[in-house]
């Protein structure tokens, strides 16, 4: 990303780079941009090293869920593949990402109205447990999955995007609304 940033800077091109909530360990949640990143794996470490926080470049920390074109290995695709089965839903795994559809709309809004944003900004939804998220997807997509509450895994990588929302006035829909839009788009 840093080489790409240099090329963009040289050619007066705006770079919008994507980072992840995985730059944080998940030990506390509600992370702000000012919180010290503490990744716990190579993915989080590599994404942190790639963040651009200089010049006119924009790094967006976020996470998203939605359909995949090829691999079909994302959380969303896995949930859909569990139709008519029984699975565990982690009630202490807290998530604040967006659907891919909503994220695309946010990026479009940034390009159209907020191209002056630069530095590292976090974009997130209201926090939700993976258990509750699976319930919403299960209901909307009529998957007939029996979801068991599981509290054995704990991770809260929820992001606080109050700064972004205040600066841009971009409103992130509820999880019910985002999943409904994803359903209607499929």
Predicted regions and their residues:
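Conserved catalytic Lys-bearing alpha helix of Rossmann-like short-chain dehydrogenase/reductases
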Residues: 1-4, 43-51
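Active-site "gating" loop of Rossmann-like NAD(P)-dependent oxidoreductase/epimerase domains
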Residues: 21-41
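NAD(P)-cofactor binding segment of oxidoreductase domains
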Residues: 1-16
